[in-house]
Amino acid sequence: MNHFRKMEVINLTTLPMIPVDEHLAVSLVARNTMVKTVRKELENNPPSCLIGSMHQVNQKIADINLRTEPSANSLAIERFELEKKALREKTRSSPEDKVKRQRKSQYSCKGSELRHARSSVIKRKTADKNLLAELYQYSNFNSSKPNKLPNGVDFCDMVGNVVRAERDCLSGKHFCSGRELEKFLSSSSPRAIWLDSFWWIFHERYQPNKELQNNLFDRIAQHYALLLFRVPKSHSEEALLKRLPSLLSKAVYTSFCCCFPQSWFDTHEFKSDICNTMSLWISGTYPSPQSYDSWDYSELDPERFRREELMLYRRRLTKGREFSLFAGKRAFSQKPAQSRKFYHPQSSSANSPSEKTSSAKQNSEKSLRMQNTAKEHHCQTLVLKKPTQEVKRISEARECENMFPKKSCAACKSPELTSNLFNIYGKSPLIVYFLQNYASLQQHGKNVLIVRREKTTSTPDCTPTYTDVISETLCSMKKRKDNLNQLYQHHWTEWNYFDKHLKELQDNFSREMKNIDPKAADTKKANHMFIPPSAVNEESPDKKTKEGKGGEGKRRETEVEHFFPLTSKP
């Protein structure tokens, strides 16, 4: 038996069973915690694996219990939940303590930044048809308290998403304390505003119901007024109230993304609708256009972010392979050119031996300096301390930030600012509604209006950016360069053909000249073989005058007579 135990230990170490998580909507911290829990369960109940000789295998099979028993191993997450629930029931002392603890923990989300969703995983297996926002069936309106988030999504998990999204990626700090932000969002009034705003936007977009939406808006106004009228307020609460529209926009967005992971919410229309609604309800003004571009979507929409990150990583791998091949070819083509460049100064300095020795000394000194600096740098790196966790996190955040392309501005004229009247005292629709319906005092005083120029319209998404213009310009330049190279090659082929044709003509001409030259030499040689007659030159002057008067015909006859030999004389 000890031998089999050793074999089980060997199986665990050599063939570990790694659990695979298919629910990408859960945060990374939650997934890591779930993996640790399942691994602990596997260590406590190791799987049986038959490894060894045939004798050991047969002995192991003989020792197997063949009786039918129900499966002893359950899901690790379900078992952990059952044990945790039983432990809570044992520790509770009385019903009064139970009620007190329920009241105290009703709106508490301690440790939500590191919290992971366990129960939602089990419920989502049977609620796949409701993962689309368009097909979800809304339950009845609860007038006593806000309805919970759909599909078993825990509210504290959403609080953790917003808290992590408010953290600066490089410094890792919030605009206020993380605990203060967590405590504020999990308190009763912001929680009610959050949930009712979620359901109001859900009904506004997918299932319009004016009566139900009016009830939701009424409760939102009451909780917002209660939040403002509560005194005293700390400095952090004042800062949180100023950023409340942005916080609620992120909260509603991450709730939609996590509750309905099969729907697509990464659109300009949906995000601008959420931001405009929250800002108009609370402050009465529109937010800056496209303020959602600076959100941390790795925390607000983790499933889509991981998918895009994986696709981008694959594109980078393919581009890196192409670039490595291109760089290798380029380096191979540059090697002979570099050798030729290095050869010229040697040939030019061959005539002066003094210059050659001085250059050799300089090269040796430079090499010694380079070696010394390299040694010093190596010693410094050994002496330096290891980077801390914060430095590693900042470097990872910068790498992640550099992985995604930076946003480029639109290559067009910015939209004109519009003039709107703004009330200095503020006119929040929620407060106005609360005062009109629940306040006993009438509004007094006057409105002080000023002209406020704001940017209400944004450039359309189809507008090309400077990056697009630069890429199109580079593509056109590359295309023109290719066309020029093709024209250059065509030009050289035509010139080569023309040179070849001229060479053929010249060869034919030289061949014909070689055939003509012997014939001319033979005729010239034949002409020199004949002796010219002397009697022709001693003719009388009367005959010459007659010949001159006789015309060109007789002259030609006399010229012909010079070429005939004089055979006989009378």
Curated annotation (Swiss-Prot):
Biased composition (Basic and acidic residues): 87-99, 363-374, 540-562
Pfam family, one: FWWh
Assigned keywords, A-Z: Phosphoprotein
Ranges of compositional bias, category Polar residues: 345-362
Keyword Zinc recorded: no
InterPro entries reported in the protein's UniProt record: FAM227
Disordered as annotated region, ranges: 87-112, 336-374, 519-570
Record-listed Phosphotyrosine modification sites: Y343
Phosphoserine carried by residues: S348, S349
Family per similarity comment: Belongs to the FAM227 family.
UniProt protein name: Protein FAM227A
Lineage start: Eukaryota, Metazoa, Chordata, Craniata, Vertebrata
Designated gene of the protein: FAM227A
